[in-house]
C-alpha cells in the first residue's frame, strides 16, 4: 500500500507551478523512506496565503504574523492513529504560505519549487517528531536530514538555480 498525500490549494496569491504537486509527493515519500517509516502514511498539505497562515500562527503559536510553514502532527511519541478506510497512519497536516515561499525563493535565488520542497521536507520531519525550537543538537540533526533528503531529490542547497 502506498502513502497518501492530499494536497489542497486554498489561495490565489501565487500560481502553483506545474509539477509542484508531484514534487511534494516525492518529498513526503523521500522523508518517510529516509526515516525508515514502514507503514503507509497519510499527510495533508494545504497551500494558503499570508493572511491565512498569520491567523493560524496566532491561533496555535500566539505569534500574530505570517510564517512560511506550519506543521500539525497527529502522532504522539511515534504512535499514530490509523485511518480505517485506507489503513494509513495519519501523520498530520502541513500548511504552506505560498506568498512567503515565493518571497523566500526570490530572496535565496532559487525556484519556488525548491523552496516548497524544502518547506515540505522540514514540515514532514516535524510530523515525525523532530523539533528545532530549542536549537542545539536536535536542530542540527534536523537540518542535516533536510539537506540529505533534498540532495536525494536532486535539490541541493549549493546548486545555482535558474528558472
Question: Model features per residue range: what roles?
Answer:
Residues 1-117, 125-163:
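An acidic/histidine-cluster motif and surrounding catalytic segment
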Amino acid at each position: 500500500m502506498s502513502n497518501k498525500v492530499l494536497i489542497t490549494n486554498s489561495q490565489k496569491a501565487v500560481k502553483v507551478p506545474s509539477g509542484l504537486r508531484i514534487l511534494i509527493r516525492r518529498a513526503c515519500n523521500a522523508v518517510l523512506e529516509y526515516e525508515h517509516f514502514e507503514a503507509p502514511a497519510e499527510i495533508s498539505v494545504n497551500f494558503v496565503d499570508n493572511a491565512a497562515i498569520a491567523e493560524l500562527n496566532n491561533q496555535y503559536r500566539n505569534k500574530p504574523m505570517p510564517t512560511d510553514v506550519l506543521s500539525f502532527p497527529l502522532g504522539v511519541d511515534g504512535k499514530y492513529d490509523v485511518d480505517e478506510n485506507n489503513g494509513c497512519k495519519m501523520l498530520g497536516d502541513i500548511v504552506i504560505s505560498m506568498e512567503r515561499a515565493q518571497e523566500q525563493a526570490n530572496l535565496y535565488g532559487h525556484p519556488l519549487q525548491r523552496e516548497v520542497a524544502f518547506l515540505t521536507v522540514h514540515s514532514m520531519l516535524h510530523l515525525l517528531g523532530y523539533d528545532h525550537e530549542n536549537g542545539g543538537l536536535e536542530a542540527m540533526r534536523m537540518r542535516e536530514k533536510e539537506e540529505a533528503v533534498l540532495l536525494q531529490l536532486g535539490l541541493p542547497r549549493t546548486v545555482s538555480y535558474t528558472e
